[in-house]
Amino acid sequence: MSIKRHALTLAAATLLAAGLSGCVGAIVGGAAVGGASAIDRRSTGAQADDEVMELRIRNTANTYLRQNNAAEGFEPKLAVVSYNRHILLLGQVATEGEKNFVEQVARAEQSAQAVYNYIEVAPQARTFGNVSADTWSTTKVRTTLLGIQGVIPSRVKIVTYEGTTYVMGILTPEEQAAVTEKVSTTAGVQKVVTLYQTYIQQP
C-alpha cells in the first residue's frame, strides 16, 4: 500500500472514530479550546478545525510510523499544534522520509492554511531532563506574558521543544513586538521561533 493511500485510509478511520466518540476538549498551549471564545480571535469554526486536525494528524501519522518503524527499538514522538488552521509539527523520527510523511499528512488536511515542519531526524529518545527543562521554560514564559500591558496571554500559544520556544497567536504588530521581546529575554530561553498571524484592528 502506498504512503498516500495508507494516510488516506488511516485518516478516514480516525475521523470515523472521532465522530463516534464525540468531541474531546483539549488544552493546548495553556488555553482551553472553546472555553475562551469571548476573547479568542479565532472563529468558532477555526477553533473546531484546530482541535480535529491535531487529533487526526497525530493519530494518522503515529499509526503509520509505528507500523513502519525505520529504526528498531525507536518509538517516534510527535506533537501537533494547530492555531487558526496553521499547523506546527514537532517531535523526533528516524528518517527524512518519516519527517516528510508527517508533513504530507498535515498538508492533506483541507482546512490547513500553513504547515511548519520542525520535526527532528534523531533516532534517540528524549531524556526526562529534556522534557522537564522544556516544561519549566514554557511555564516561565507564560508567567512573563502576564506582565505585558495590553496583551491577553490566552491569545498566545507557547510550546517549548528541545530548548526552542515556539510562539503562535493572532496579534497586532505591536503585540507581536512586545511578546517577542518578553519571550526572548526570559531567563533560560535558548531560541525563539515566532509563527504569528497578524491581526488588523478595525477602525
Which residues are covered by each model-predicted region?
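Short, intrinsically disordered, charge-biased short linear motifs at domain edges
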Residues: 9
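N-terminal targeting leaders
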Residues: 2-6, 15, 22-203
